[in-house]
Regions:
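Gly/Pro-rich active-site loop or hairpin
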Residues: 115, 147-161, 181-222
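An acidic- and aromatic-residue-enriched active-site/binding cleft used to recognize and process polar
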Residues: 141-143, 177-179, 208
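Hydrophobic faces of well-ordered beta-strands that scaffold small-molecule active sites
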Residues: 136-138, 172-176, 201-205
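Extended, charge-rich helix/loop segments that form flexible
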Residues: 15-114
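Acidic (Asp/Glu)-rich catalytic clusters
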Residues: 126-133, 163-171, 190-200
Length: 222
């Protein structure tokens, strides 16, 4: 189970090369901001970025090519949404408009409403999980901070503790994604692993390296 906000798993380079011949995912915050502000044109988006980031977006606008813009659209919308949800496909006309309609589905939904929806769902399915011995595991938001104005509800220690306590059942557990959690400088991944070990039902062992400016890159393959 992913939180609803994980609908926006946003990366700008899905094939960032490493010296050993492998590749991984790279998040460039300024290019993501450019997509949000100049391509998507989301209302109020400028409030989500610092003055320094807005200035960098303005500079990028002077040099970015149409091919690079198309690549951002393809990476952030077509490839990512096609993989995660299957609701956008290669060859779809005007994927930006399709994506805007998907975002509009969350209009008026705040953090508290999304939390309550999660609590309601988990409470409803726990009796069935108990009956059949099924463990549910919630995947952290990826990345673990707000994007595109959407509420994020599984980003840190407090969030994880909240959903585990909201439906305090051993079948309600965590997917411990080291990559997602370590992308947030606010998270101590080792301590989180220790604290929530008993309620961790599935593990994604891949780390990320956080860099200045909000960028991060997933490590090479284990």
């Amino acid at each position: 189970l992913s939180s609803a906000a994980s609908d926006v798993y946003k990366r700008q380079d899905l094939q960032h090369p490493w010296a050993d011949g492998t590749s991984s995912l790279y998040f460039d915050r300024v290019r993501f901001a450019y997509f949000d502000l100049r391509i998507l044109g989301r209302e109020g988006a400028e409030k989500d970025y610092s003055a320094e980031e807005l200035a960098k977006v303005a500079e990028l606008d002077k040099t970015i090519t149409e091919a690079e813009k198309d690549d951002l659209i393809d990476t952030i919308i077509v490839k990512t949404q096609g993989f995660v949800n299957g609701n956008i496909k290669e060859g779809d006309k005007n994927p930006v408009n399709i994506f805007k309609k998907l975002l509009a589905l969350y209009k008026g939904i705040d953090r508290d409403m999304l939390r309550e929806n999660m609590r309601y769902f988990l409470a409803a399915v726990m009796p069935v999980c108990e009956e059949y011995g099924v463990n549910m595991c919630v995947h952290p938001d990826d990345p673990p901070f707000q994007v595109l104005g959407l509420p994020r509800i599984v980003t840190n220690e407090a969030d994880i503790a909240w959903f585990l306590n909201a439906v305090d059942n051993p079948h309600n557990g965590l997917t411990f994604c080291a990559g997602s959690l370590s992308a947030g400088e606010h998270n101590d991944t080792r301590e989180l692993a220790k604290k929530f070990a008993k309620r961790t039902h599935f593990v994604h062992l891949r780390s990320t390296a956080a860099m200045p400016g909000g960028n991060f890159i997933e490590s090479s393959h284990l």
